[in-house]
Amino acid sequence: MNRITETFARLRSSGRIALMPYLTVGFPERESTLELVPALEAAGASLFELGIPFSDPLADGATIQRATQRALENGVTIADCITTVAQLRARNVKAPLLLMGYYNPLLRYGLERACAELAAAGGDGWIIPDLPLEEAAELRPIAAAHHLDLIMFIAPTTPPTRITQIVAHASGFLYIVSLTGVTGARQTLAANLADLITTVRQQTDLPLVVGFGISQPSHVAEVARLADGAIVGSALIDRLERLAPSERVSGATAYIRELVSATERVH
């Protein structure tokens, strides 16, 4: 049983869903990720999505685009992101760590090299929003050979036949996109989210983790009625952007603790 599977099994038995923060590696400062992840894990975060900075982040809204630009200005590369994973393991972080990035930079870096290095660093998988199912055929076996999960996306616009195909090739968990459009904090989640999750649940036992638009404890509580985890990204990045440097870790920790308080399963 790998780290991701173990994490969801443990949460299920304790009656909670996962809270998964997204952090852009090297934002706000180059070393920030090394300070934030251990603190947020201690606050109750269960898994981490660590973003590789890229100059053309298609799926991301303005908040994460700004964070990405800052990380690029800080000189952060794919190799640095993999090193960050190893450094977090050296700091005794136990939670699953997944790198989120876009496919072209990964392809240029080398799929075999990237997977071998991430596995050796103690990483658990990849989240690649611009990689459609058909094109994932090259990366999937390489990732699997290194015991890394390749996380697949299902959106409100994904047709039922396509959901069946995606589920057949998925591992780790499924990333359920709660809204159409780019990432960013919203006031409400999609009205048809429950229907989408019901459709996917009929086809798989994999954990379902909801992302895009989650910013409040009420959103997490809503997800806890439906799914197995909630991802918070833009709302966390937004706080880190606004907080004074001396208050970033404590402010982010307080926010994550508030969201974790809403993770009790109610279905």
UniProtKB/Swiss-Prot annotation:
GO terms for cellular component: cytosol. Its EC number is 4.2.1.20. Pfam families: Trp_syntA. Tetramer of two alpha and two beta chains. Belongs to the TrpA family. The alpha subunit is responsible for the aldol cleavage of indoleglycerol phosphate to indole and glyceraldehyde 3-phosphate. This is Tryptophan synthase alpha chain.
